[in-house]
Amino acid sequence: LGNRQMTITVNREYNVHYNKKRIRRLMQILCLKSVCRKKRYNYIKSTPEVTAKNILNRDFHADKSNEKWLTDVTEFKYYVGTEVRKIYLSAILDLYDRRIVSYKIGGSNNNPLVFDTFDEAVKANPDAHPLFHSDRGFQYTSKIFHNKLIAANMRQSMSRVGRCIDNGPMEGFWGILKSEMYYLRKFTSRDDLISAIKRYLHFYNNKRYQQRLNCMTPMEFHRAAA
C-alpha cells in the first residue's frame, strides 16, 4: 500500500486520525514501500464484427450505481518448473462505487470467459441497464456479445483504437490488483494464484477503503447509496 491508502486503512481500522505525513514518515522508518505498477501488454488482433462509438468519452463520473460499467480482461503468469503458464481474469467494474460487479477466471482469453462474466453481472443486477464500455477486444466486437447487450437493454461504448486511457479506471484497477497482490510474489501453482485473486477481489470490494468513496469500501458505498 502507498502512504495515502495506508493512512485511510489505519484510520478506519483503528479509529484514529493520523495524517498522511505521519504515516509516510513511519513507513519510511519501517522501510515500507508500495510496489510500482508495470505497463500492460495484452493484445489479440482480430477483425471486428461490431464496433461502437466512444460514448463514454472519458466521462468517468457516475451519479448512481449501475449507470456505467467498464470491463476488460487481464492475464496472470505462474510457473511450473521453467515453464510459464497463464490464466485470465475478466471483470466488470461499476464507475459509481468502483465495486467489481462480477468476474470470471479461466485458462483461455476466449468468448466464454467474457460472456460468462457478463451473464453473471446481469443475473445479479436484473434491473441494471448501464452504459457498457470496453476496449475493442475480439470478444466485445462479436455479434454474439452485441446481441447480449441489446437483450439486456444496454448501450455499447468502446475505446478508440490504441487509446487505453479511454478505459482508464479499469486499467487503474488492474494496476491496483497486481501491485498489491500479484507482483509481491512468484506463483508456482495455478490453484494458489486463483485463490489469491479471489481473496483479493473480496478484500477490494469489502475491505479496501478508497478516498474517492469518502474513505468507504466499494460495497459500503454501494449499500449507503441504495
Model regions and ranges:
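Basic, flexible linker segments flanking DNA-binding modules
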Residues: 1-64, 163, 217-226
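An active-site-proximal beta-strand-loop segment
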Residues: 58, 62-101, 107
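Mobile genetic element proteins and their domesticated derivatives, centered on retroelements
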Residues: 6, 23, 27, 56, ...
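RNase H-like polynucleotidyl transferase catalytic core
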Residues: 36-41, 131-136, 150-169, 185-188
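Active-site beta-loop-alpha junctions of metal-dependent nucleic acid enzymes
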Residues: 85, 104-125
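Short small-residue beta-strand/loop micro-motif enriched in glycine and branched aliphatics
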Residues: 97-103, 156-159, 183-184
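C-terminal domain-tail junction helix/linker
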Residues: 143, 150-154, 176-226
